[in-house]
């Protein structure tokens, strides 16, 4: 079943390029209930065949302050504009369905980057900032063996909503948030938006394509 909000998101005028392809992720198949929350394209396959939609957007990073998991108050544009490619998702720590799968994908992607992992900035922004304190985010990050290149962020409710709206994530309720991963090669470049569950291998392929890295330059293990 495709909701009205899903249809609206799929037909957003900001899309410059889009494609739909089958996801190969076993967790996605096992978590059928989670896929219901993903932003699906208007034309979809049956629910038993999860889909991944890849599009390109020009997002404006909002000038908001967030609190990093180390307790430091930071400006989001500065965090994203440190020269590294950015891989971004939105989670909350008490989520028991979608978020653990998304974070596990990040964890495996981080491993597959190998020696190049410190060249990428992985970012997870909480959509439940009232509950997700920096201490809780640190505990959550440890569960997924997040390295120093993968940071988690909280802040005020207003700042979290501004970030969600800026990147087309906001769905009105944290329990129905979309399964979206966003990638950007460098400041000022367009964002690659991946809607739906993607395997760590597929995410690595998208990353390589985005930054123009030769296949052998990123460890795959």
Sequence positions of predicted segments:
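Short, internal strand/loop/helix patches
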Residues: 139-178
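N-proximal helix/coil linker or "cap" segments that precede and/or mark the start of modular domains
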Residues: 40-63, 81-83
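A short beta-strand-turn-helix
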Residues: 65-85
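N-terminal secretory signal peptides that target proteins for export/translocation
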Residues: 1-20
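Thiol-/selenol-based redox modules, centered on thioredoxin-like
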Residues: 177-221
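Short active-site neighborhood of thiol/selenol oxidoreductases, capturing the structured segment around
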Residues: 79-99, 106
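Thiol-based oxidoreductase modules, predominantly thioredoxin-like and allied folds used
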Residues: 119-132, 149-158
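Conserved helix-turn-beta segment immediately C-terminal to the redox Cys motif
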Residues: 103-124
């Amino acid at each position: 079943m495709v909701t009205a909000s899903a249809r609206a998101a799929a037909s957003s005028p900001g899309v410059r390029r889009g494609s739909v392809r089958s996801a190969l992720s076993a967790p996605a198949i096992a978590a059928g209930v989670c896929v219901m929350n993903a932003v699906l394209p208007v034309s979809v396959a049956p629910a038993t065949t999860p889909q991944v939609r890849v599009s390109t957007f020009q997002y404006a990073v909002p000038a908001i302050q967030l609190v990093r998991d180390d307790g430091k108050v930071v400006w989001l544009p500065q965090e994203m504009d440190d020269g590294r490619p950015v891989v971004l998702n939105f989670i909350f720590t008490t989520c028991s369905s979608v978020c653990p799968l998304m974070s596990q994908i990040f964890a495996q992607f981080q491993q597959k980057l190998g020696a190049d992992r410190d060249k990428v900035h992985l970012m997870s922004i909480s959509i439940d900032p009232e509950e997700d304190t920096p201490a809780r985010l640190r505990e959550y990050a440890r569960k997924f063996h997040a390295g120093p290149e993968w940071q988690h962020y909280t802040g005020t409710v207003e700042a979290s909503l501004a970030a969600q709206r800026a990147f087309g994530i906001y769905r009105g309720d944290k329990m129905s948030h979309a399964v979206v991963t966003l990638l950007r090669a460098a400041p000022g470049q367009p964002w690659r938006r991946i809607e739906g569950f993607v395997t760590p291998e597929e995410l690595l392929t998208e990353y390589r394509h985005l930054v123009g890295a030769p296949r052998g330059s990123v460890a795959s293990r």
